[in-house]
Amino acid sequence: MALKVGIVAGEASGDTLGAAFIAAVRAREPGAQFFGVAGPKMIAAGCEAWESAETLAVMGVTEVLRHLPRLWRLRRRLEARFREARPDVFVGIDAPEFNLGLGRRLKGAMRTVQYVSPQVWAWRQGRVRSIGASCDLVLCLLPFERRFYDEHQVPAVFVGHPLADRIPLEVDRDAARRALSLPAGATVVAVLPGSRLGEVARLGED
C-alpha cells in the first residue's frame, strides 16, 4: 500500500521545507500520498491541500490572541480529518505551538514527527518534555540540536536544511547585481519585511 503522510506547514518557510520534504520522500516512495495544510510549493509538489499554509501565518501576542479561536477550531477540524484519513505518519513543519499540540492529540493513533525543532536549547528548556510527549521523532535543521535531544532521550535526527545545497556560502556580488539588473557601483538597500501577511502589513503602514 502507498505511504500516506498527513502534513501541516505554516507560512512560506514551512512551504519551502515541505516541498523539499515531499520531493525527498517521493524519491524513495514514488506513490506516497500527502495531504493537510500546504502552501503553493507543496501543492505543486503534489500535496492535497485541505487548508492554506497562510492560515497559520500569525505572529506576535496580539495577532495570535486575535486569531486564537480560529486556530483552535482549525486544530480540532484537522485532528478529526487526520483520524478519519488515517495516515501512516503526521508531520508538523515548524509552527511548533500549533503542530505540537496537534501531534499530542494524534500520537498513538499514528506516528508523529516534528520537522524543525523549536529553539528549546536556547530558552525554556523544560519544553523538551512536552516535545517528547507530542512526537515520536524530531527532524533537526542544525547538528547540535540532535545532540541536545539525545541528552534528553528524545528521538531526533539531523537532516539539515534543503536550501543549504542551493545557496552558495560565497556569493558573487557582481553576478547577483546583474541578475537583479542593479548598477554595479550603486548603493543598494534591501527591504525585507518578512513572509507573513500580517507582518508585512504592520511594517509597511508608515
Task: Locate each region found by the language model.
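Short active-site neighborhood of thiol/selenol oxidoreductases, capturing the structured segment around
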Residues: 189
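Phosphate-coordination loops involved in phosphoryl transfer and adenosine-cofactor binding
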Residues: 2, 183-186
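Active-site and donor-binding regions of nucleotide-sugar-utilizing enzymes
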Residues: 3-177, 192-204
